[in-house]
Amino acid sequence: MSYNADEDQIKDKLEQLRCHFTWELIIEETEIPDLENRVWEQITFLDTNYKVGIHNLLAYVKHLKGQNEEALKSLQEAEDLTQPEHANQSEVRSMVTWGNYAWLHYHMGHQAEAQIYLDKVKNICRKLTNSSSYRMECPQMDCEEGWALLKCGGKNYERAKVCFEKALEVDPENPEFSTGYAIVVYRLDGFNKAPESSGEFCLNTLKQAVRLNPNNAYIKALLGLKLQDVDQEAEGEKYIEEALTSASSKTYVYRYAAKFYRRKGVLDEALRLSKLALKETPSSAFLHHQTGLCYKSQIIEIKKVTNCQPKGQDKENINRIVPLAIQHFEQAVQLKPTFEFAYTSLAEMYAEAGDHKKAEDTFQKVLCMKSVDKEMLQHIHFHYGRFLEFHKKSEVDAISHYLKAIKIENASIDKNKSINSLMKLASKKLRRNASDIESLSILGFIHKVKGEINEALEYYEQALRLAPDLETSVPVTPRH
């Protein structure tokens, strides 16, 4: 048999494996440094019995960077941990590591070594399922795939959720499966959070995970945040305090506790915890963004107290805090160039500092990003609209972006905020000019979106009386 035929045969076997090379993990090239950093943080600071999968993911990341020898070392570490962590399932848990070994050796041109690991996988499949294939369907493998997808970012979360659901169907009381499922449901709930969402399902999955993992401080901290989301802040704080007293996953607990106290308005404590976490993980984009948000909240608080007219010491405090917020937001986007939320926060702070050019450039950069999900697009258009309305004093352009946020078919807080901002702006224009056809049409459109058909018709009819040939089935697009 020719070399090419041998290679094709091995490739066919490799593609049957269940491992990081076949799970179609969605990782953009610009995200690799941040992903590698997060994996290192988890290896160093996350107290878990499931580090085999983390070392496997690190090996895959090393391969993506072209560092195959380093990847082999990470796989060796995963192999060394398999027996201590999974004594009762070491053979099944080894299949992912062996699959990664096989793929890695194949990419390095080591066909004989690749075949050795393929044979290892095949032997386990034959032993446990009487199958001669190179893959096995079992909840442990579904769980391994779920963890890999979960750790690779938001574009993989829906598939991760399906994997953990499959695993839980077989073993609903499994602590590891429950933990993975609770985390991915929490993340997805955060992405898709609409104002009318109760978060009850997410809350129940977290409570189940805490019940099955009573010593897991990480999960307790997430439960505390979710309780805060659903207006049970006092109950949530109990879990946060409990997590803070634990020695487990301290750095991660600091992160989430800081977020909790920032949202509660206890900004000094939030900053203290953020700085403690940053001391351990200075390359965390998430932490830099959270720290920047603490400073931003301080600015909002000063403006609130001074009725948006800070003077004297208050003005000096804002001038001191704004550069600190900018510094952390800049660091966040530098560490994670696809961090859309941080770009929006950074643009707002540039505007606060009076640097409209940098603010405009930053908004344009994030608007031009590929594969931005609906919720984030609404967030960007709303905040860009605010910048255009209040900093650039461009009502026409602001209206355009509020409309873009509203037209996206997705219920979200930022969509509601855009509706309210657009209604205020159109009403203000109408008070200046009662015959403003554009504002009448926009108000008609807003009431239509809100399901208030009678009110919508009233505004459309007023607009038609002023311009009989006006098309009212869609909102008037602002003229540029």
Model segments located where?
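Flexible helix-coil transition and linker loops at the boundaries of alpha-helical arrays
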Residues: W40-D47, L81-V92, I124-C138, F177, ...
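TPR alpha-solenoid repeat register
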Residues: I54, T97, S131, F177, ...
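Solenoidal tandem-repeat scaffolds enriched in leucines and small polar residues
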Residues: I124, L128-A247
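N-terminal alpha-helical scaffolding segments that mark the starts
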Residues: M1-N56, T477-R479
